[in-house]
């Protein structure tokens, strides 16, 4: 140990250690091998530095980071005699592959030996059978014929051996054809790995690639599964027949037929004899059962997929001249009812409905609708109107009318979707045969839709139309029922038709030329087909002009010879002075500014409009200004704001309800989400207002009403009816089921908004020209419907015909279209007996089309 301490430190500055050599190392150096490789960079110390008994040892590099000095660079030694991980992996799978390949080879050799053994035994059996036949022949024949029989036997030996070789070859081929796929699928990964040298990058195995290709083939191509099943069946028949040919004495054709019978019917193998034929027959029958199980599965899946496609509405609608409805809303039921009534005269029709809903849900909702379709069939399909493929699925290019329903919810979003739907419809390559009727939610967006759709589009601004209609009905009680009769197809509606026999006739004479219709206007051909409502009596019909009439159906009227009608004069010239009115709005609508503008144009000066809702006053003014209303420019009305809840009695009692001429209960869209909830709120407000009004009636009126005994069982209804004679209340009703409640109580002249919009959509869908007529009747300017008192046209007890009153109304530039008797509940539009004379009462009222005052 003292010798080691004498080693100079300066000679090992590079972390090189020197070990002394023990004596037994020097004595037997060959007996112990070196544990470390010799470092080529070892620096030998000078021999003079060490004593004579000390031997210089080699330096060894350890796996430590060398500390380099300023004069020396670090040296890195690479050890390369250890095998890499890649080489070990290659050796592992090569050894496994060799072992498994050897096992497969031994199996094949064993099978071949068995096959050869079987062949040898079969040849021995054939030889023994030949010897038996020869001995039997020798016993029967004389000795002279032995040579000939021997020659005959020698001639037959060669064909028998050839036949045996063929059968053995067939048996061998059948086994090989069964083993080859197994070997390929078993060792295909090793083949793919053998192509990888030392590349350690990740690659997909060939087995997975083949499985992926098969999966793509089966999923992409529609006839892939039946084709695979057919190929599997043919392979089973071929392999089975080939195997039967090897184990039986039948020819190949008969063996193939037997194989088919085993595949087709698993019970046919019961007649097989022998171990070999029975094993093969059982195997073929088992494969046949699998084949038929797969076939039944494919057939069942195909049938289920087809029924599922039909159930979910994925199949194509092969129809022509049908009505197509895109979208789903609460108006669909009323719309289907009106279209079914319109198609009744044609023997029924076809209506296709496509919406982004499940087909079963749509059919279930339509099945719950309580009306008769009258021979019209409704077909539902699931899809989006924004996708051209879904539009083609409902034969959009062959439809005679396309109706686009507005969505429930935000008006701008609904109109934006309608705009995109129109863009999709105009992008159909085949073109459109019919016109497009679009239900709009906001009047400001109507221009954009017409700009995109062009001449193909007809718009019905539902919300604004209902608002203006409510104002008309509020100022003229009973007008709501008249609008329902005219817009619906159940009674009389508008029709336009050309009658060449009327050319050259004055419009005054045309008015009394139709016994079953009432002319209302002329479609002037010289004006580009413009419809003129209520033209002058002196207008002469020209060639190409068409007559606008109100009739029960398009085939129920025709011109007749002119009747003899006595012309009279009006009793006196009535001029109704306008008096200020007080109107109350309960609730809030998004088109409030439009309703205020219409009221300001129709009411007398110094009129008042009270707005009662839960919207703060500052927010109301902001909404009205944003809608384009300048409150300072209102000429005839002044706004009175009251804040409160319309379903709270205490808030309603703070209003002078008995002093209003008209009360409009609006469906408050900001509060309620569904039609039923909105109607419930409107109905509650209506009953509260009528009850408050009835309690504020004078005592004398209530006493006289009670003494009459008319309402002994329901005095509250009688009191409300008494109050309704003073104030007209119009309720905006969204759900048609609420109609019966209000009609039974008779306490409100209701407006069924959704049903009226559906009627307008159906009418424009059947004839797009009617849209111009409706737009003028609903607009601020032009003509409108009015209810007139009878004393304007006749005297008390005067006997006149309907035609005579019509000619008197023409002196006021009005077109008489119907009447309502004093003791009747409903008006009669387009009465049948127009020439029959009868006595009239001054309490009767007449319905006319006249210019707006």
Swiss-Prot record:
Main location group: nucleus
UniProt keywords, alphabetically: Coiled coil, Ion channel, Ion transport, Membrane, Nucleus, Transmembrane, Transmembrane helix, Transport
Mutagenesis / variant outcome for changing residue 760 to T: In castor-14; no nodules formation or arbuscular mycorrhizal symbiosis
Coiled coil regions, renumbered to chain: 117-137
Summary of the tissues where the protein is detected: Expressed in infected and uninfected roots, leaves, seed pods, and flower buds.
Entry keyword Hydrolase: no
Location relative to the cell: Nucleus membrane
Bilayer topology: Multi-pass membrane protein
Task of the protein: Ion channel with a moderate preference for potassium over sodium and calcium. Involved in perinuclear calcium spiking but not in cytosolic calcium influx. Closed at negative voltages in presence of magnesium. Required for early signal transduction events leading to endosymbiosis. Acts early in a signal transduction chain leading from the perception of Nod factor to the activation of calcium spiking. Also involved in fungal entry into root epidermal cells during the establishment of the arbuscular mycorrhizal symbiosis.
Membership in a protein family: Belongs to the castor/pollux (TC 1.A.1.23) family.
Protein name stated in the entry: Ion channel CASTOR
